[in-house]
Design a protein with these regions (language model features):
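Structured mid-to-C-terminal alpha-helical surface segments
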Residues: 1-191
Length: 191
């Protein structure tokens, strides 16, 4: 579609596609634009058909699988030589995990026995798939700086969390202490 305002980054939709991980389990979700909602609310339905703005379904990775993959990714990258720089590149994972843990299905999943079993399966899958960082495959998760020294690590990461996430968010981001506490609680479930 032609944009009225050129160079406005807010006029773009970013779709992330990951080809590294196993895309299962997935679930179909309906994508419905705010423009569609606005046109319905203002009784301008004729534009929906005219501009092909109808909702559509897309297969997306389940929330539970997303949560597990983000946790495993953080563990893996924590074994880089420069942990702070490496984890800084994944800072959005902390934000995502925080919001996933606001979802009732994710809360119940994390409390279940299946959580640790599936975490271990994804961890093993990543050990087989990814050689970087060097030597990480033979290390126990209990050796991860995210477990051994998270408070110190988070002190070095929280500024990146505040600045980077605030730049992308349309509303205030969650308090970094709440995000850290959420992550620590998740780590307790995999130790």
């Amino acid at each position: 579609y032609e944009a009225i305002k050129k160079g406005n980054t807010d006029s773009k939709l970013i779709v992330e596609i990951n080809s590294f991980a196993n895309p299962f389990p997935y679930q179909p979700l309906t994508i419905r634009s705010m423009v569609f909602d606005f046109l319905i609310e203002t009784n301008n339905e004729e534009y929906i058909e005219q501009y092909n703005l109808k909702p559509f379904e897309i297969n997306v990775l389940s929330k539970e699988q997303t949560l597990l993959e983000k946790m495993v990714s953080l563990i893996r990258f924590s074994f880089e030589k420069n942990t702070v720089v490496s984890i800084s590149g994944k800072i959005r994972h902390f934000y995502d995990l925080y919001y996933l843990m606001k979802n009732q299905a994710c809360i119940e999943f994390v409390a279940s026995d299946l959580f640790k079993i599936q975490f271990d399966a994804i961890l093993q899958h990543d050990r087989e798939m990814f050689e970087e960082p060097e030597g990480w495959q033979s290390k126990s998760i209990s050796q991860s700086p995210l477990i051994t020294d998270f408070p110190h690590l988070w002190k070095q990461l929280k500024e990146k969390y505040q600045t980077e996430l605030s730049a992308f968010a349309y509303r205030p981001i969650p308090n970094e202490n709440e995000v850290a506490k959420c992550f620590e609680n998740l780590m307790k479930r995999i130790e």
